Swiss-Prot record:
Keyword Membrane listed: yes
InterPro entries in the cross-refs: GTD-bd, MYOB
Record GO cellular component, one term: membrane
GTD-binding domain: residues covered: 411-509
Region called Disordered, residue ranges: 164-184, 608-640
Localization: Endomembrane system
Tissue expression per record: Expressed in leaf epidermal cells, roots and root hairs.
Topology in membrane: Single-pass membrane protein
Origin organism lineage: Eukaryota, Viridiplantae, Streptophyta, Embryophyta, Tracheophyta
Entry protein name: Myosin-binding protein 2
Complexes and interactors: Interacts with myosin XI-K and XI-1.
Pfam families linked to this entry: Zein-binding
Superkingdom, natural source: Eukaryota
Coiled-coil region: 589-621, 676-710
Length: 749
């Protein structure tokens, strides 16, 4: 995977579990977007086919060239997998014009032409070791029924002392392949292939051309010699696709630098820390690497490096060293072979082979090469590839045998397997830790949910209780409101009653004033009468006793009036409201009135008896009218007693007074004065008795009404309701009486 800022940032700031989860999510997102892209591409093609339109080019429809900030032509070779890249490389020239667009037609055409270029196009690179030969094989690689030449392999010899390559040259010369075997028949094909060798690790001079074209592959080579270092093979070749699969000893703590050129350079950089010591003798390696051996197979295995030009514009491949599986890109079809000769020492010193970065740059075609010469060169190139592949296979077997025989060395595959097992164990440990954390988080989540549920239940209970209290408060508030309303109504009623009672009290006060005025007038009249009687009795001696009696009676009448006035003032006003309390008062007043009535009746009877005796004496002294007068007097006395008992004394006395005035007008003054005084006393007594009887009747009626009220109160709510109705009617009647009294008072005023 390409290293960028996001990957570096997330590697540094996150742990491994989070990193795995993040990349899993990103990969699934990428799969989803790829699926959408595939669906849209399929619909676009179906749409074009259905309406007979020309199918669009998949590469021309891309927007990379519009959004590329570098301004260079975009590379589409990284968008092709190995299978489709091989299919594009294997297409002939005549099929290159089929439905890929102008740019991609040129790309396929260039790939087909480069396939046919002989390996003799690349001249050998001169160095301190001499010219590097490029043997050409006869066989190519067959993949999916298609034949293509082998890939490029470069071997390096490593010794203790490092030897700079081309120390005298800062820029290597451009070598062209001699054209002794073929001639150019067609000048339309023009290609130039330049090979540059540079070393980044040992400060070797870079081999470069001044021409800057589209594609470039840099393969820096470092050659180091060692006297006693063992030989080491840093890679092996896959049998099917001949990709470079780097293998080296790796420390987990070391980070391997991954270099990716913007122009699509294919760069492999390996830093070797440990030397792989082979147990085999140096003769086996020297037989493989020495160009002077007699056997052709050993001569073929002396190839140190082979390179192949890529058809596409640029090839980007970044190889990650370690337990990750390396990414491989298909290398081009034009090989370039570089032979580094092996120098054997007499002491058969072991040598170490190290694979370093080799940069190969391809230029735009500038040579006119004959097509027939290219076809002939292709056959020799395929045979060289076949022999190279066989030699590398034998070398791999020898190196593996040497590793087995070496007690200190460890096989690369075994070490990789061991590291893979360690990584798996670590991964299992991480998974177990993740499972433990997941279980802990699940337990914590369950506890949290239980706590949340408990809090929700408590909250619901508190809400229900709050609602219940709220309802109770609302009901209590309603009850209080009703009670306040009732109290307000009662207050209004009480105020009305107080106002009515005040009005009634005012009426009673007026009545009292009237009664007092009447009483005063009566007192004045009685005094006038008494004064007249006293003056008359003072003239005669016979009138002394009667005068004393009259004074006594007068004083007694005044005291009785005062007592009655005080009694009227002590009469309760709110009799109806305080029923039970007033019953006793009524009974006491009734008894007092009855006692006074008895006293007055006794006095009346005494007076009547005295009058009867005097009249009898007068009748005996008269001249013969005793019988008639006696008969009349008996009738009168009997009538008087009946009137007293029936409370009709005043009209009777008036009638008697009228008769006596008419009948005895010629009598003496003594008799007339005596009769007038007696009549005045009788009138006052009769008035008092009438008033007492009226009051007694009122008290009796009130007493009966109060008894009925108390009985109705004892019966319950119905009686109380009935009593309220009766009282309301009484109030209405009283209001009517009060209004009449007021109207009468206003009229009188």
């Amino acid at each position: 995977m390409a290293a960028n800022k996001f990957a570096t940032l997330i590697h540094r700031k996150t742990n491994r579990i989070t990193l795995i989860l993040v990349y899993a999510f990103l990969e699934w997102s990428l799969i989803f977007f790829i699926l959408l892209n595939s669906l849209f591409s399929y619909f676009i093609l179906r749409f074009a086919d259905y309406f007979g339109l020309k199918r669009p080019c998949l590469f021309c429809s891309r927007l990379d060239r519009f959004f590329d900030a570098s301004g260079k032509s975009p590379s589409h070779r990284d968008l092709l997998c190995d299978d489709h890249a091989l299919q594009l490389h294997s297409k002939p020239v005549e099929e290159s014009n089929c439905g890929f667009g102008e740019f991609h037609n040129d790309l396929v055409h260039r790939g087909c032409c480069v396939e046919k270029i002989s390996s003799s196009l690349c001249a050998p690179i001169e160095s301190d070791f001499g010219n590097l030969d490029y043997p050409i094989g006869d066989e190519g690689q067959i993949y999916n029924g298609l034949k293509f030449p082998r890939s490029i392999f470069v071997f390096e010899e490593e010794k203790v002392g490092s030897v700079n390559l081309n120390d005298s040259q800062e820029e290597t010369e451009e070598k062209k392949v001699p054209q002794s075997h073929e001639k150019l028949e067609d000048d339309d094909v023009d290609e130039e292939f330049s090979c540059y060798v540079s070393s980044f690790d040992c400060k070797n001079k870079e081999i470069a051309t001044e021409k800057e074209e589209e594609n470039r592959v840099d393969l820096p080579i470092e050659v180091e010699t060692a006297e006693s270092a063992p030989k080491n093979l840093e890679f092996y070749i896959d049998e099917e696709d001949c990709h470079l699969i780097p293998v080296e000893f790796y420390k987990p703590s070391e980070e391997v630098r991954e270099i990716s050129d913007i122009n699509g350079d294919f760069i492999l950089d390996f830093g070797v820390e440990h030397d792989f010591t082979a147990a085999a003798e140096t003769e086996e390696i020297s037989d493989f690497a020495s160009p002077g051996e007699s056997k052709p197979e050993d001569a073929e295995t002396n190839l140190v490096a082979s390179e192949m030009e890529n058809d596409d514009e640029e090839t980007d491949a970044e190889v990650s060293i370690g337990t990750e599986i390396p990414d491989h890109e298909q290398i081009g079809d034009i090989p370039s072979h570089q032979l580094i000769p092996h120098h054997d020492d007499d002491d058969h010193e072991e040598e170490t082979l190290e694979f370093k970065t080799v940069t190969i740059e391809t230029k735009m075609p500038v040579l006119n090469i004959n097509e027939e010469r290219i076809l002939e060169a292709q056959g020799s190139m395929e045979s060289s590839h076949s022999s190279l592949h066989n030699a590398m296979f034998h070398l791999e077997q020898r190196v593996s045998v040497d590793g087995i025989e070496c007690p200190e060395g460890v096989l690369t595959v075994d070490k990789l397997k061991f590291e893979l097992q360690e990584e798996r164990k670590a991964l299992h440990a991480l998974y177990e830790e993740l499972e433990v954390e997941r279980n802990a988080s699940a337990v914590a989540a369950s506890e949290t949910m239980a706590m949340i549920n408990r809090l929700h239940e408590e909250k619901a209970a508190m809400q229900m209780e709050a609602l219940q209290y709220q309802r109770m408060m609302e009901e209590q508030a309603e009850f209080d409101q009703e009670a306040l309303q009732l109290l307000n109504e009662l207050m209004v009623n009480r105020e009305k009653e107080n106002a009515e009672l005040e009005k009634e009290l005012e009426v009673y006060r007026k009545r009292m004033e009237e009664y007092e005025a009447k009483e005063k007038m009566g007192m004045l009249r009685r005094r006038l009468r008494d004064s007249s009687v006293d003056s008359y009795r003072n003239n005669g001696d016979s009138d002394e006793n009667s005068n004393g009696e009259l004074q006594f009676k007068n004083v007694e009448g005044v005291t009785d009036w005062k007592y009655r006035e005080n009694e009227m003032e002590n009469t309760p006003v709110d009799v109806v409201l305080r029923l039970d309390e007033c019953l006793d008062d009524y009974d006491g007043e009734r008894l007092s009135i009855l006692g006074r009535l008895k006293f007055l009746e006794e006095k009346l009877t005494d007076l009547n008896n005295e009058e009867d005796d005097e009249e009898e004496a007068k009748t005996f002294e008269s001249n013969g009218s005793i019988n008639g007068n006696e008969h009349i007097h008996g009738k009168e006395t009997n009538g008087k007693h009946r009137v007293i008992k029936s409370k009709r004394l005043l009209p009777l006395f008036d009638a008697v007074d009228g008769e006596m005035e008419n009948g005895l007008s010629n009598g003496n003054h003594h008799e007339n004065g005596f009769d007038d005084s007696e009549k005045g006393e009788n009138v006052t007594i009769e008035e008092e008795v009438d008033e007492l009887y009226e009051r007694l009747e009122a008290l009796e009626a009130d007493r009966e009404f109060l008894r009925h009220c108390v009985g109705s109160l004892k019966k319950g709510d119905k009686g109380v309701h009935l009593l309220h109705e009766i009282l309301q009617h009484l109030r209405d009647l009283r209001n009517i009486d009060l209004t009449r009294v007021r109207e009468n008072g206003d009229m009188s005023l």
